[in-house]
């Protein structure tokens, strides 16, 4: 399926080397402030063009908002955003037509669709398609700003190098002023060295990120299959390359006694609140007013220059593949922006489901 969400719904489309990728966002109330600059800002955060090995394609992200927005405000109708694919070199992929790349979706798509799929640049399974999710996230973040919710993230691991410094939310915000959004300067230096090493080896590296949501009102989420973390886990695994997901203190809780794992409950400003937040802002999958946070990990980019064993599907015999096209030495920084975006989409959906914002009422501009 290419559609996600219940009240705030997104439908993405497009392939890596097609004319464009894009998204249709439905469920946005009328009167919400939304500009092209909002979308441009999020798309540019994803690019990392100042580090060419992280984004050798580095497209300028030419996009258009085709519908649903007029004079800087939403119309309450579907918002269609198209992002044109410009820097496409499909010749690299001619020899890959019948040689599926190990670790990529090529083999799975061949087994499911036969020859009826676009393999160039990874096609529908490419990280390029996350540009559409980031555009949808720009709309979702506009919805969340209206209710005081902020979504932000940072890199916590890259190429086996993990951050070790303690940090605050403000440190996470400031990390985006660095070459990579990493709060720990010593770890950042080692991560850059790992990137250089991978480039010299003709290889790639994976890593992990952490995403926070601040100002989330209590009461979002529903029992069992409507839990916030269930929806966010599904959303996270929809981002290409995600291999693991951890909510709150995650695995560390499994090593504690219950008395250590539980967050004490106290009173803040006359309301019950968590004294600590090992639970990641959720109890029973429902928000309690504390910050939400989770971590996700990405495998190394499957496309590498080192020779790899595969199969020639035309001859049905083993062969060796040496990839000659452009590839990202790591997708982690760009994928972080996509994870922020899909987190915003999930939370915007739950804000609408809870009735905090009504789809059938304009946010502003009403004459009655």
From Swiss-Prot:
Residue positions binding FMN: 124-126, 284, 299-303, 326
Gene3D superfamilies reported in the protein's UniProt record: Chorismate synthase AroC
Keywords: Amino-acid biosynthesis, Aromatic amino acid biosynthesis, FAD, Flavoprotein, FMN, Lyase, NADP
Coiled-coil portions: none
A GO term from the CC aspect: cytosol
Pathway: Metabolic intermediate biosynthesis; chorismate biosynthesis; chorismate from D-erythrose 4-phosphate and phosphoenolpyruvate: step 7/7
Catalyzed reactions per annotation: 5-O-(1-carboxyvinyl)-3-phosphoshikimate = chorismate + phosphate
Annotated NADP(+) binding sites: 46
Cofactor: FMNH2
EC number: 4.2.3.5
Name assigned to this protein: Chorismate synthase
């Amino acid at each position: 399926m290419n559609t996600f969400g219940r009240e705030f719904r997104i439908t993405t489309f497009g392939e890596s080397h097609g004319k464009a990728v894009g998204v249709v966002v439905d469920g946005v109330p009328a009167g919400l402030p939304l500009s092209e600059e909002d979308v441009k800002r999020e798309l540019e955060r994803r690019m990392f063009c100042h580090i060419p090995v992280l984004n050798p394609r580095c497209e300028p992200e030419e996009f258009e908002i085709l519908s649903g927005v007029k004079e800087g405000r939403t119309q309450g109708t579907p918002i269609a955003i198209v992002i044109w694919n410009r820097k496409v070199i499909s010749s690299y992929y001619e020899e890959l037509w019948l040689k599926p790349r190990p670790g990529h979706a090529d083999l799975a798509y061949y087994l499911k669709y036969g020859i009826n799929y676009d393999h160039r640049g990874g096609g529908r399974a490419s990280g390029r398609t996350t540009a559409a999710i980031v555009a949808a996230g720009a709309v979702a973040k506009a919805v969340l700003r209206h209710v005081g919710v902020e979504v932000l993230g940072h890199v916590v691991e890259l190429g086996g190098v993990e951050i070790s410094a303690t940090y605050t939310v403000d440190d996470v915000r400031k990390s985006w002023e660095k070459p990579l959004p990493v709060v720990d300067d010593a770890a950042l230096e080692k991560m850059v060295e790992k990137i250089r090493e991978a480039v010299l080896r003709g290889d790639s590296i994976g890593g992990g990120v952490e995403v926070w949501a601040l100002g989330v009102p209590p009461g979002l989420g529903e029992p069992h299959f409507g839990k916030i973390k269930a929806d966010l886990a599904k959303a996270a695994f929809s981002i290409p390359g995600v291999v693991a997901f951890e909510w709150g203190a995650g695995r560390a809780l499994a090593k504690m006694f219950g008395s250590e794992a539980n967050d004490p409950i106290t009173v803040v400003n006359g309301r019950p609140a968590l004294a600590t937040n090992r639970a990641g802002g959720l109890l029973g999958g429902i928000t309690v007013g504390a910050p939400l946070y989770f971590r996700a990990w990405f495998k190394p980019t499957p496309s590498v220059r080192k020779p790899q064993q595969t199969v020639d599907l035309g001859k049905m015999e083993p062969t060796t593949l040496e990839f000659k096209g452009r590839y990202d030495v790591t997708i982690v920084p760009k994928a972080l922006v996509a994870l922020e975006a899909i987190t915003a989409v999930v939370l915007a959906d739950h804000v609408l489901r809870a009735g905090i914002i009504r789809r059938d009422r304009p946010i502003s501009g009403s004459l009655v």
